[in-house]
């Protein structure tokens, strides 16, 4: 059964669809008319491309004989998204000929296969978002020209069955039950030669794992990944979007951003990076300065803007770990280096808790025991800034139910989560639009993500909320669709960090250029 949402704002609709696909891992279709309508989808298409989210854009168009002649709502829509989509198909004029219907069905298959090139199944029980988004999924576009009369005639016999495969719904055909969608590709395994090469690089060396967005897609995978890393004495530096901070294992390093804030941080000789670089800019810069050997594990591309890739392994992180475990031969990294990272992480954990308390005192004027606080206390560590967001984020995380979703805006919101989301709190799905790191359509994306969870908490700053305030109008449509399905609408709690823009631009060199900075960069809201 297909669920249909109607939204009058194409930009908001596109990010809502992005959120639906991001959370479920299934392709979501975006339908629009011609003209500026599909142009409003462009930002979401760019985010889907860089975040590897399966999005199918179906645009209506005017017929060929009206193109280039000034006809209303008519522009050149052929390859409108250029190379930002995985596949573009220009459809013929709609007609009922069997060959045209067969082409349309084949085009639908091609679009789905291109949106999910890893072969993810589209039927019930399909793989979840992080798997789909780790196998080079992405947006696709089909453009449909229509001529008048535009009203379809649904009374035509066989309009929905024409051109179907003989295996669709056939009874008694061997294996037909499993042909509802593309078959799921088998897991990839490393060759023995690659396993030996990787093991040779990490054996006895100071090595660590940098786990980026979408490293693990379930709690079971996270446990498996942590066990593998510990068996190899590899500190597992866990980005907040990696799926690993639900664990409390000693080898899971959640405070690595603050560890890198000290000059004496444990310097690696080898880094194994899973997927995208982490949120922490300090981590990326410090590692680039030290230039260790870097092994990049990713299903499709290096995503290496620092040009540090020494060895690229094309597979998913979990298949990488399983392959190494299956290969014979010991390859433990330096045990002393592993212990050094665990100790440094534990020390930063206690400092973060003290900064959290300092933030709470600044916000409430009271200590945890209720005592009044006079004056500002100095932070214990220069690596951690005592911003008020810390106390808020910790309280939000404590109140967020286990198994629910925490969707974060970019800018200061995701950085606050990176600092104050302490490992082992509870299993959460933490998501964010990190493809282009922008604030566009964030409210709408959060609402789309929320349709996949019973409870979603959305953390955002004031700039981001204002930028997509119109997305809140979707709530009426969401409630109506839920009522039609006889189900309650999913719950979403919006937490606003009303922090006058968050101050992230104050970190730029231009911050010292007054009066231009306040007018052109910080754009204060007060």
Question: What kind of region is each of these model predictions?
Answer:
Residues 59-109, 118-123, 127, 239-349, ...:
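Glycine-rich, acidic loop regions that bind phosphate or pyrophosphate groups
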Residues 58, 65-82, 89, 421-526:
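Thiamine diphosphate
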Residues 110, 114-204:
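Conformationally flexible catalytic loops at phosphate/diphosphate-handling active centers
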Residues 171-177, 288-414:
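Phosphate/pyrophosphate-binding active-site segments
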